[in-house]
Amino acid sequence: MVRKAFKMQLFEGQAKEYEKRHNELWPEMKEMIHEYGGSNYTIFLDEETNVLYGYIELEDEEKWDKTAETEICKKWWAFMADIMETNPDNSPVSVSLKNVFHLD
């Protein structure tokens, strides 16, 4: 199992909308996340800076990387592009975080 953490940037004033969209996460998006080996997916928000911190556990990182090629992922990115920083392909601007400690 691989633990991944990352940060993303939410636009000012979009916290409630971001949370709403994730509370209503499409069933096919949930299925895709599990199909590609993702679990224990959690996103936190720093309300002072609008920085999102994500954490996910993966069965296989190479398999997970293929989620970006799925139509449902591309559709989700387009859906979220108006409320957060994105790359030209609508994927969220995401910065990987270094794991410096873990305790089971």
Curated annotation (Swiss-Prot):
Pfam families: rhaM. It is an enzyme of class 5 (isomerase). Pathway: Carbohydrate metabolism; L-rhamnose metabolism. Keywords: Carbohydrate metabolism, Cytoplasm, Isomerase, Rhamnose metabolism. Substrate binds at Y18, Y41, W76, W77. One of its GO terms (molecular function) is L-rhamnose mutarotase activity. GO terms for biological process: rhamnose catabolic process. Its main location: cytoplasm. It is found in: Cytoplasm. Homodimer. Belongs to the rhamnose mutarotase family. This is L-rhamnose mutarotase.
